[in-house]
Amino acid sequence: MIKKIHSLEKAVVFAFNLEGWDLIHTGETCLPFDAQGTTPKGRKAVIEMKFREKYYETKILEVSKYNALINLDTDIEKFYYVQDPKANYLFWLNELIDLQKQELYCPNTTMWNKSKRNKNVYLLTEEQARIINPNTNADTET
């Protein structure tokens, strides 16, 4: 499973680089993001990525992940990329304000433990995404 996720992350990095970004994949490290480099405008940037097999109207961002990213140097642009069956979403975390923390019963983040626990999360709406690229033939009813 982790190899598949890393392959998806690398594919996203490749696609972004085709659009003028200069990113390297960091998903195999213990850093709180999956890619780092510069935007097409030359600004320092990091991207955290999530790949969802099921479509949900809101996109979950764990408060701990958000805090780890937003507390990086202020000259770094922080992005959250979500891919689901409907579309690909890019959230610019630097501009999100007044996020409302919620507690949800979610799966543990470890692959070795199938248990669930309460997590503090932000629920991001699709309207908050900076860029949305619809997936063709998306089936959101699954």
What are the residue ranges of the model-derived segments?
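Short amphipathic alpha-helical segments and helix-helix/interface helices
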Residues: V13, Y66-I70
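Beta-rich catalytic cores
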Residues: L31
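A structural signal for short, well-ordered beta-strand segments and their strand-loop junctions
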Residues: H25, V46, F79-Q83
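Acidic-basic catalytic patches of nuclease active cores, encompassing PD-(D/E)XK
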Residues: M1-G27
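Intrinsically disordered, low-complexity terminal regions enriched in charged/polar residues
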Residues: L90-T142
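Active-site-adjacent loop/helix micro-motif of nuclease/hydrolase catalytic cores
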Residues: E53-S64
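Nucleic-acid nuclease catalytic cores
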Residues: I70-D98
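Conserved catalytic cores of phosphodiester-cleaving nucleases, focusing on short active-site segments
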Residues: A35-G37, K41-Y55
